[in-house]
């Protein structure tokens, strides 16, 4: 089994939905967001880019938001607090505190060893491998629901997790499967 302390995971992106519990006049909100775009004929919300934290917000008149590009849940909380403070300055009344729901977290990582993906694909259940279409094995984890892309270099991308703990659990499940089928054993060097 691979030593889990040697496996590295890094958050690349977090997407969250947010309910502000307030109706918004998007024309007024537009003035609060200097780095923003609003064209209701093309898209029904404001696309707003913040520099600190570095995230993008999709702001809808219903008071619903989508926050993307965050590297931490704290970044999302800071972005929502920053927007809420600006909205209060133009008289927006909130029925209650904003509700943040993480929808997806994307992690990149490294298992620390190389793999023969043809062997992995023929051996592991719950995976797909079409090297003409995509250079990695697509491994689906049922619980916690997520997808891991495994590349021959040992690099991985885990998406669909709702928390860092879920991502680690998904990676542990992949490693257990690889170990179960002997795919983590060191290959002997040919003489």
Swiss-Prot record:
Family the UniProt entry places it in: Belongs to the TBP family.
UniProt-listed SUPFAM superfamilies: TATA-box binding protein-like
Gene: tbp
Sequence repeats: from-to residues: 11-87, 102-178
Pfam families cross-referenced by the UniProt entry: TBP
PANTHER family assigned to the protein according to its UniProt record, in alphabetical order: TATA-BOX BINDING PROTEIN (PTHR10126)
PROSITE patterns: TFIID (PS00351)
Protein name: TATA-box-binding protein
One GO biological process term: DNA-templated transcription initiation
UniProt-listed Gene3D superfamilies: TATA-Binding Protein (3.30.310.10)
GO MF annotation terms: DNA binding; DNA-binding transcription factor activity
Free-text function comment from the UniProt entry: General factor that plays a role in the activation of archaeal genes transcribed by RNA polymerase. Binds specifically to the TATA box promoter element which lies close to the position of transcription initiation.
Organism of this sequence: Pyrococcus woesei
CDD domains: TBP_archaea (cd04518)
UniProt keyword terms in alphabetical order: DNA-binding, Repeat, Transcription, Transcription regulation
